[in-house]
Amino acid sequence: MNTVRVTFLLVFVLAVSLGQGDKDENRMEMQEKTEQGKSYLDFAENLLLQKLEELEAKLLEEDSEESRNSRQKRCIGEGVPCDENDPRRCSGLVCLKPTLHGIWYKSYYCYKK
């Protein structure tokens, strides 16, 4: 039993004495690792920024493009919103304010003459 204790004590002392390094070495190693991590984070941040700028440019380009659906639509039937100042919108119909009040009370709609 004593040999086991002595062996354990010897292994413990060796592990503690050999395992402890210089504080300066540990500090330098930690600084190197953090600097590498910072450079990696800077690289990742720049890459993400480039991708976001490309995406933003693409979205702005899509918004500014004219499509055939972006032009003003004409009234094609009764009950469709219209502009009171543009009589062409309601061809064959009259652009009037609704008689019933509701959430649409400020807008005009096409009605039959």
Swiss-Prot record:
It is found in: Secreted. The keyword Disulfide bond applies. One of its GO terms (cellular component) is extracellular region. The keyword Magnesium does not apply. Probable ion channel inhibitor. Belongs to the neurotoxin 14 (magi-1) family. 01 (HNTX-16) subfamily. This is U11-theraphotoxin-Hhn1i.
